[in-house]
Amino acid sequence: MIDADGFRANVGIILANTQGQVLWAKRIGHNAWQFPQGGIDRGETPMDAMYRELWEEVGLHPRHVDLLAVTQDWLRYRLPKRYVRHGQYPLCIGQKQKWFLLRLDEPNTQHIRFDEGKPEFDNWQWVSYWYPLGQVIHFKRSVYRRALQELVPELPLQQGLIIPEQNNHLLVE
């Protein structure tokens, strides 16, 4: 669903383990890594979309995870001009996202799979909480930063995690 301003409603998923690491997934056919995310279908709530995307993209059911937090507001990013499809209506100029922080206990890691529906990822790894800031494609970076900063207080294990300064992409373990 694209709103009147041209932003597609979307959910993002930060899936953390009990050590505070997050699932980082590699897109099929690309050397591009990101958090799982996906559009909200007509009639769906953001929560419904998050659980659907969790199943479609990662193979996990709600029973495998604990919901820790959700961003308060929609976080928006604009697509670079080369990614805007000018021949489509309504015109989508970016995404507005609700971000969800989920916890996955180690025994449920065995349920992670990328063979449901139309797979979008072909590999994954656990990375430190702030690692994605230095790796995600540039136009998503500020949304990732805002989501990670807002949600970090809800992580069960925060020892040693430090919120980076605005321009600092160094990793802190």
From Swiss-Prot:
Gene3D superfamilies: Nucleoside Triphosphate Pyrophosphohydrolase. GO terms for molecular function: pyrophosphatase activity. Keywords: Hydrolase. Its cofactor is a divalent metal cation. A motif (Nudix box) lies at residues 38-59. Pfam families: NUDIX. Its EC number is 3.6.1.-. The keyword Chaperone does not apply. It comes from the Bacteria. InterPro entries: Nudix_hydrolase, NUDIX_hydrolase-like_dom_sf, NUDIX_hydrolase_CS, NUDIX_hydrolase_dom, RppH. The keyword Hydrolase applies. Residues 6-149 form the Nudix hydrolase domain. Signal peptide: none annotated. Accelerates the degradation of transcripts by removing pyrophosphate from the 5'-end of triphosphorylated RNA, leading to a more labile monophosphorylated state that can stimulate subsequent ribonuclease cleavage. Belongs to the Nudix hydrolase family. RppH subfamily. HAMAP family: Nudix_RppH (MF_00298). This is RNA pyrophosphohydrolase. It comes from Psychrobacter cryohalolentis (strain ATCC BAA-1226 / DSM 17306 / VKM B-2378 / K5).
